[in-house]
Swiss-Prot record:
Residue numbers bearing the Phosphoserine modification: S573
Localization per record: Membrane
The encoding gene: MUP1
Record lineage: Eukaryota, Fungi, Dikarya, Ascomycota, Saccharomycotina
Record's signal peptide: none
Protein name per the record: High-affinity methionine permease
InterPro entries on file: AA/rel_permease1, AminoAcid_Transporter
Source organism: Saccharomyces cerevisiae (strain ATCC 204508 / S288c)
Length: 574
């Protein structure tokens, strides 16, 4: 009956042989009889309920691996590069620290929203799965919007620029608009090349550089406490905590929201495990431990690092340091040579983040190609010639290059930061508001929704309102001279973000409406279980003159069409 159906009853997943389908689905519950170590079902606990079929591929990621995925993605250059900007916008040490605490609370609430969706739909794909589950009509519309969001944003560009600035500082070379651009492009190209030619070497570099990140932030934190205790040379202290809230009155609504954007930029990555949940051992237990552990650890470390900055760096230097605050911190504590060494280490940390981001983005582009969403899908789905998503990686390299070269050099890092954060807030608002709608539907008895981890109405509502504020507030005009950009309008990142989503809407009209009408076919989709054991959506064209009216055909005819389409595309992409 309709009131007893699961929320995801239209996702069409089932079992056959190598390629498996279903035209209807019921609640998936792991029973005691199915928990068998031999068939891999021991990755789930008896009695757990899921709103989708479970991936059957190899489970490789445990708790420590998932903690590493989150920390390596979150700990990029944010805490090294944005603290100066946050202090400048807030006007005081106390308010700046409060912004870091507020950002951490927003990120933790977001983590629990993603954990709820992740334990309801423990499959690879992250927010794409959740958006498609919430916004089922018009079909393919939200998929096109999400594809545009992924395709046109240069996620790795900001940290590539920061890597360039850090390496130039380490070399004691003046940073100019062209050398930072040139090295920034070279950094992205290096990341593209490594991840394309040898995936194992790329992962090895990411892990090694991840150790550098943890070591740097721990060392800065300890040094800060030593400074507060008067343990530096000649008992030096900055005395920034004598009146911690002095200057708070200069903060504006525009400054607060942009400071919060910078903080949230530093927490991007808390949902990183959701992209690979199909490969996680016992995803419910793993998320319960890995998610909160990573977030609490990094939130505390971020606060300690900022306390260290304020304990050592005088206020005038805090304002002028911009992206090289960490290097100036080491300069004050240990001298000029330490500044150059610190800049090199922070540059390596940024490089590790670039490697991690382009690694993930290339695979998302490849997956969109495999599903059939992108034009020239076979091209983007290909793993030739090095068994890597080289085309997807190259696409992200091109977008990052344009993002690095297009804006004025002084504004490039902040533009990328805001250009990533703003549309991400739109996505997060849609997901959290959708979860509130699910709660309402469940309360009305219209759907079943009982994932193992629940964020709850209060946490989800807080995350929804936080993102709504972050969507609206950037339109408040800044006071004179307060704009975060020196050569561009303060609203430029908002316009670009909405333009990208608008393009996704236009693509939907052309790809999913006009072309099928002109070509006399319909786009149909099924969740397909491939030979690798992982479920993925497959979109295929079903021509009217081949099988008649698609809406009246039995599922077997359509499934046969998709299977053949899926097999042929797999063969072409190998």
């Amino acid at each position: 009956m309709s009131e007893g159906r699961t929320f995801l009853s239209q996702l069409n997943v089932f079992n056959k042989e190598n390629y498996q389908f279903s035209s209807s689905t019921t609640k998936k519950e792991v029973s005691n009889s199915t928990v068998d170590a031999d068939n891999g079902a021991s990755d789930f606990e008896a009695g757990q309920q899921f709103a989708t079929e479970l991936d059957q591929g190899e489970k490789q990621l445990g708790i420590l691996s998932c903690i590493g995925l989150i920390c390596n993605r979150m700990l990029g250059t944010g805490v090294f590069a944005v603290s100066s900007t946050i202090y400048t916008l807030c006007g005081s040490v106390g308010l700046a620290l409060i912004m870091w605490a507020v950002g951490a609370i927003i990120a933790i609430s977001g983590l629990y929203v993603y954990m709820e969706f992740g334990t309801a739909i423990p499959k690879n794909g992250g927010e794409k799965n959740y958006l498609e589950a919430i916004f089922r009509k018009p079909k393919f519309f939200i998929t096109c919007m999400y594809a545009a969001y992924i395709f046109f944003l240069g996620w790795a560009a900001g940290n590539s620029i920061n890597t360039a600035i850090m390496f130039l500082t380490a070399a004691d070379t003046e940073v100019t608009k062209w050398n930072q651009r040139g090295i920034g492009v070279a950094v992205v190209f290096f990341a593209f090349l490594i991840n394309s030619l040898n995936v194992k070497i790329g992962l090895y570099l990411q892990n090694i550089l991840g150790i550098f990140k943890i070591g740097i932030v721990l060392f800065i934190s300890i040094t800060g406490w030593v400074a507060l205790g008067g343990g530096l040379k000649d008992g030096y202290q900055s005395h920034n905590f004598r009146n911690a809230f002095e200057g708070t009155e200069t903060a504006t609504a525009y400054g607060i929201v942009n400071a919060l954007y910078s903080v949230i930029w530093s927490f991007v990555g808390y949902s990183n495990v959701n992209y690979a949940l199909g490969e996680v051992k016992n995803p419910v237990r793993t998320l319960k431990i890995a998610g909160p552990t990573s977030m609490v650890f990094l939130a505390i470390i971020y606060i300690f690092v900022n306390i260290a900055y304020f304990a050592v760096v005088p206020k005038d230097k805090l304002i002028s340091s911009k992206l090289i605050l960490a290097a100036d911190f080491f300069d004050i504590v240990f001298g000029g040579q330490a500044k150059r060494a610190a800049a090199a280490l922070v540059g390596l940390s940024a490089l590790g983040n670039v490697l991690s981001v382009i690694f993930s983005q290339g695979r998302i582009i490849q997956q969109l190609g495999r599903e059939g969403v992108l034009p020239f899908s076979n091209f983007f789905a290909s793993s030739k010639p090095f068994n890597s998503p080289m085309v997807g990686l190259f696409q992200h390299f091109i977008v990052c290059t344009v993002t690095i070269l297009a804006p004025p050099p002084g504004d490039a890092y902040l533009l990328v930061q805001n250009l990533i954060s703003y549309p991400m807030n739109i996505i997060n608002f849609a997901i959290s508001a959708g979860l509130l709608w699910i709660y309402w539907q469940r309360r009305q008895g219209k759907i079943e929704w009982n994932p193992p981890i629940k964020a709850g109405v209060f946490v989800t509502g807080f995350f929804t309102l936080s993102n709504l504020y972050l969507i609206i507030a950037p339109y408040v005009p800044p006071s004179n001279g307060e704009s975060v950009y020196s050569s561009m309008p303060y609203w430029i990142h908002c316009v670009i973000a909405w333009g990208i989503f608008f393009f996704g809407g236009v693509y939907y009209v052309v790809w999913a409406q006009l072309l099928p009408r002109w070509g006399h076919y319909k786009l149909v989709s099924k969740d397909v279980l491939g030979e690798d054991g992982f479920w993925r959506v497959k979109i295929a064209k079903v021509y009217d003159d081949t099988i008649g009216d698609v809406d009246t055909q039995e599922d077997g005819v359509i499934e046969t069409n998709i299977i053949e389409h899926y097999k042929s595309e797999q063969e072409k992409s190998l």
